[in-house]
Amino acid sequence: MTTIINMKIKSLAHLLFFSGMVAGLTMASPSLATTTPNGIESSATEAVKGTINDLIQVLDDETLKQPEQAEERRHEIEEIIKHRVDYEEMAKRALGAHWSTLSPRDQHEFVDLFVQLLRDTFVGRITEHSDEQVVFLGELREEAFADVKAQMKGRKIDTPVDFRLIRRAHEWRVYDVVIDGASIVSNYRSQFTSIIRDLSYVGLVKKMKQKAVAVKVFEKSPAP
């Protein structure tokens, strides 16, 4: 069934990967849980719609739009997002085959660095708005994974958007967003693979710590 949500977000991904907190790996709060009151699991689509609706409430809050409330607004957005994105899964997929070669300690360090990279990439775009509708077209599920199909209805063109989610303990969490064929995870993986090939994994970590990694996240990435 097609569902439409009116919204004022230029790019959903600007918000979905804005949070810079590894606490995104913790359990969701009751208001964001993807189970119904009787304990029955809801769909991945409902999880995405719930997240968008919560974000819209914050973005449309006139009090939080005041300049002196900028930090509070950002905090409230982060509180929503950190319960809805699986940063570990995202980092694992972005690093690709190199992930399995790392120790648990190095994996944790990489997740920390990756989340900070996401935050640096998207932090400046949080105020980008335009009146759009999100039309949910359906979802595909295979075991613990789901692909929620949607369209952003623009004034001139419609843009296909896929939300990719993984189920963790009866909760659906986003680990990638594909906008008009451009996957955020794939673009990071392409860049990371190139840096590792040229410099080694240690070189990649060094560049991430120096904030010297720049990825055009909404462009279709070439094969690594």
Which residues does each predicted region cover?
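Bacterial N-terminal signal peptides
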Residues: 15-27
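Early exported N-terminus immediately downstream of N-terminal targeting peptides
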Residues: 38-118
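Surface-exposed, charged secondary-structure patches
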Residues: 120-159, 211-224
